Amino acid sequence: MRFNQYSYINFPKENVLSELKKCGFDLQNTANHKDSLETFLRRFFFTYQDTNYPLSILAADKKTDLLTFFQSEDELTADIFYTVAFQLLGFSYLVDFEDSDVFRKETGFPIIYGDLIENLYQLLNTRTKKGNTLIDQLVSDGLIPEDNDYHYFNGKSLATFSNQDVIREVVYVESRVDTDQKGLSDLVKVSIIRPRFDGKIPAIMTASPYHQGTNDKASDKALYKMEGELEVKLPHKIELEKPQLNLVQPQGQAELIAEAEEKLTHINSSYTLNDYFLPRGFANLYVSGVGTKDSTGFMTNGDYQQIEAYKNVIDWLNGRCRAFTDHTRQRQVKADWSNGKVATTGLSYLGTMSNGLATTGVDGLEVIIAEAGISSWYNYYRENGLVTSPGGYPGEDFDSLAELTYSRNLLAGDYIRGNEAHQADLEKVKAQLDRKTGDYNQFWHDRNYLLNAHKVKAEVVFTHGSQDWNVKPLHVYQMFHALPTHIHKHLFFHNGAHVYMNNWQSIDFRESINALLTKKLLGQETDFQLPTVIWQDNTAPQTWLSLDNFGGQENCKTFSLGQEEQAIQNQYPDKDFERYSKTYQTFNTELYQGKANQITINLPVTKDLHLNGRAQLNLRIKSSTNKGLLSAQLLEFGQKKYLQPYPAILSARTIDNGRYHMLENLCELPFRPEAQRVVTKGYLNLQNRNDLLLVEDITADEWMDVQFELQPTIYKLKEGDTLRLVLYTTDFEITIRDNTDYHLTVDLAQSMLTLPC
């Protein structure tokens, strides 16, 4: 384990003493260090009647147990302090470590022995081996009462609200959209779990079209075969109009009653970060949105009608929209428990909705935590004039996602009444998708949140993985740079795939978000501020560094690609084409081994480089015909240890999100030997070689100069490493699988790779 502590706030000594005293640690500034440590530990072991026993089973050094040490005349030393501290954090002395000084250096332990009271205060705010901070572990065990009131420690809310005796209710928010054109505003179901509190509380809201269930069977039927010919497009300039949103006004009167009438029973799934905040005094709201089970309307996936309906839930929390008790719309209930302040959470589609909501500038949305979210839907299902699939899901497109998320069809009555209209709407969507050309058009323009990024007022926290080929890093990169300069923005850029990171051992992500939301949603005045970029170092396990920016580098390193012309044959023998189409993983393996139709260029790294931004290929290239698909991947090549893209379980169900509440696994990205690691990749239709909105002819056997930016990333390379650039045509995981007989030729002498560093 390595300690990477971003959540700790330096407080004045009087605040430290006061907070310690409230938790029963009655330490005196004038006492000597040894006495203070004993006082601290006897309170620490509050679950024991006889505190001599837990002291006797800890060690001060290799020869002395802690009780014996306190009974001796020996002085407290830095070595003894560290030895005790690590044992309190769950490390076994003489098993996990023997030399505390060596161990603290190896683990990056954040505490430097000096002022013992401040040391002990920071120790309580440090994460244990099992994933909780020490103070959270003690509170979970009953250090302070579960009195349904707020208690703060180091600028963070503690788990002092009951997660058993909570209010569970359902309301139906009246949206300002009518997606199915029935002349009535769509209703959106809101599932609420909130702690009991005599006052107003903030809300954690997760906008998830998956929450009420998904129609996997219908979605699978809507998948496309990826085999087909790359379209030869007519040259033209793509024209667009400003997206429009038509809103509807509230209709009719509804009796105001005091409480919701529908009780929330079981929910399909919760998000463990939300679970963590519930006993800390934050309501949990789960909203599936229009076109989902128990709501009304069509599934409009990603457009501002869908976003508006989610926004209207925040409006209801602030008294600007109505919520009914049921679908009759006869009785309404106010969110009189809400303080109006909201944070959004969730990954993938959930993070996408956070991005979209932020761009409305809605009042009350204080923070978004957008994890692996889409910023422009075109870049999810298309790339540079190509029809593409999200990584791992060949054949998926917007209409199959619509079938997946239109969960109203899971209710037989809704299916009978509404499926015909839903299918008619889906046919319109299919026509607008334009799978034929892969070009950007008005349909995608209406689902581009970057156009409204200037409206964002909330503080923004992103998480994204360098190995996320589902929602590719371009999404967070573009959103990060499109935000107004005056707002606070932060990015946790890890080396995983399309994954959550709130339960990783190496970083105090949950505690950092707690500090932020306690400040922004509960009004606690602290100096807490996250760095702009927190990056997971790819060269070592469990190592995180603060950076000033994502991209924007002034310096670059250029690699020449060679001296000769090389060709990429597009067509494969039928046997290989069928084999790759059946299992794209086989294609990826053979591509990395140099066995596919490809140009492979090994580039030795002659000095340390820190890539930060978008690698760019400048290629002189020609096609043997009037079309061309170019794929590129940049690898770090060579057998060595690399961080793996998916977290592994270190310890099962050891993280406590409250008081024995929603226990979850402690995880981390493994660091183990592999033959290579993908650094970045990209795909380009050569007819869109100069601009996404400009389609140009390709003249057979005529040279073209192409500038091709790959996916943005942050990646460290060391002298002696090897980069491998792979250029090819069809990518059997991502692109259309065109097996026509043509080839691309690259003049390597007139081509180069540029890395921002």
Curated annotation (Swiss-Prot):
Organism: Streptococcus pneumoniae (strain P1031)
Catalytic activity: Hydrolyzes Xaa-Pro-|- bonds to release unblocked, N-terminal dipeptides from substrates including Ala-Pro-|-p-nitroanilide and (sequentially) Tyr-Pro-|-Phe-Pro-|-Gly-Pro-|-Ile
Lineage, uppermost ranks: Bacteria, Bacillati, Bacillota, Bacilli, Lactobacillales
Record family assignment: Belongs to the peptidase S15 family.
Gene Ontology CC annotation, any one: cytoplasm
Keyword Protease among UniProt keywords: yes
Subunit: Homodimer.
Enzyme Commission number: 3.4.14.11
Residues making up the signal peptide according to the UniProt record: none
Keyword Ribonucleoprotein set for record: no
Active site: S348, D468, H498
MF-aspect GO terms: aminopeptidase activity; dipeptidyl-peptidase activity; serine-type peptidase activity
UniProt keyword annotations, A-Z: Aminopeptidase, Cytoplasm, Hydrolase, Protease, Serine protease
Free-text function comment from the UniProt entry: Removes N-terminal dipeptides sequentially from polypeptides having unsubstituted N-termini provided that the penultimate residue is proline.
Protein name: Xaa-Pro dipeptidyl-peptidase
Gene Ontology BP terms: proteolysis
SMART domains found in the cross-reference section: PepX_C, PepX_N
Subcellular location: Cytoplasm
Main location: cytoplasm
